[in-house]
Amino acid sequence: MPRIIGIDIPAKKKLKISLTYIYGIGPALSEEIIARLQLNPEARAAELTEEEVGRLNALLQSDYVVEGDLRRRVQSDIKRLITIHAYRGQRHRLSLPVRGQRTKTNSRTRKGKRKTVAGKKK
């Protein structure tokens, strides 16, 4: 398993798929990185040379925000929204859907387990 920026990527998978195991790199960004470094997109991750792994590490550390840095940035953005009392921040604080989804029904994942309330007596 090649180790890229501290992450073990699967050796038997093609390079395009292996790179997506790094947080912050999806299929499109993976293709872009492979093209920039002029690597063989059909090659398996295990076939990378030490020099290619070094170039990949250098590129990811210098030009892209991935893994821990990206996670910290997302968390700080959410914290900032909460402190400035933005609507999105309040939704995050209350653990409700942030992007305008309905909450009368659905949104169970975000709200948690259903709390039963006694019905009105007739």
Swiss-Prot record:
An example Gene Ontology molecular-function term: structural constituent of ribosome
Keywords on record: Ribonucleoprotein, Ribosomal protein, RNA-binding, rRNA-binding, tRNA-binding
InterPro entries hit by this protein: Rbsml_uS13_C, Ribosomal_uS13, Ribosomal_uS13-like_H2TH, Ribosomal_uS13_bac-type, Ribosomal_uS13_CS
rRNA-binding recorded as keyword: yes
Disulphides: none
UniProt superkingdom: Bacteria
Biological role stated in the UniProt entry: Located at the top of the head of the 30S subunit, it contacts several helices of the 16S rRNA. In the 70S ribosome it contacts the 23S rRNA (bridge B1a) and protein L5 of the 50S subunit (bridge B1b), connecting the 2 subunits; these bridges are implicated in subunit movement. Contacts the tRNAs in the A and P-sites.
Assembly mode: Part of the 30S ribosomal subunit. Forms a loose heterodimer with protein S19. Forms two bridges to the 50S subunit in the 70S ribosome.
Family: Belongs to the universal ribosomal protein uS13 family.
Name recorded for this polypeptide: Small ribosomal subunit protein uS13
UniProt source species: Chlamydia muridarum (strain MoPn / Nigg)
Highest classification ranks of the organism: Bacteria, Pseudomonadati, Chlamydiota, Chlamydiia, Chlamydiales
Encoding gene (name): rpsM
